[in-house]
A protein has these predicted regions:
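Amphipathic alpha-helical polymerization modules
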Residues: 1-181
Length: 181
């Protein structure tokens, strides 16, 4: 879809929680929902508003055609104005010094902690490696659990078979040594 975004890099989308706090996600399965003011708000599949580089929810006027919205690699959401000129709105991409320190709140929703360090807004800091946004893609696991379980069972059985073959070989050599005596 036009609002499916994958992040290539270490960044996270910044979103506003129901409690007013800022949280972070890599889930780029976004959609436009009706905002309180009647505009179209970019939100996660759970309805959390995606934030612009100023920390405000991204809301477009209700007169814009959402299928004409594009995203540049630097994270700018572009929509055509009345004269069909692209109007960019920056999407906040936050990076952390220590991603392992983030506190997981939900399936793909994280909160910064003292261990993760403060979020660094990529748009406002030139000293961080920039992430890029790829439109039309979603980030997903590259591991198929069922396939890997089958592979693990096959490997375990092969190991057992080899172990039994070595045990049988040892027993045969021991019997051969006993026959010499």
């Amino acid at each position: 879809s036009d609002t499916a975004f994958a992040i290539d890099g270490k960044g996270f989308f910044a979103v506003r929680g129901a409690d007013g706090n800022t949280y972070y996600t890599r889930n780029g399965n976004l959609k436009f929902t009706l905002a309180a003011n009647g505009g179209n708000m970019l939100a996660t599949s759970d309805g959390l508003p995606v934030l612009d580089t100023q920390g405000r929810p991204i809301v477009l006027g209700s007169n814009y055609v959402m299928s004409n919205v594009t995203v540049s690699k630097d994270g700018s959401l572009c929509y055509p104005d009345a004269k069909n000129n692209p109007q960019p709105i920056g999407i906040t991409i936050g990076v952390f010094q220590f991603n392992n320190g983030l506190e997981r709140l939900a399936d793909s929703l994280y909160q910064q902690t003292a261990a993760s360090g403060q979020a660094i807004n990529e748009a406002r800091n030139n000293n961080v490696e920039k992430s890029s946004i790829i439109q039309g893609y979603l980030e997903s696991s590259n591991v198929q659990v069922v396939d890997e379980m089958v592979n693990m069972i096959v490997a375990q059985r092969a190991y057992e078979l080899n172990s039994k073959a070595i045990t049988a070989s040892d027993e045969m050599l021991q019997q051969a040594n006993n026959l010499r005596r």
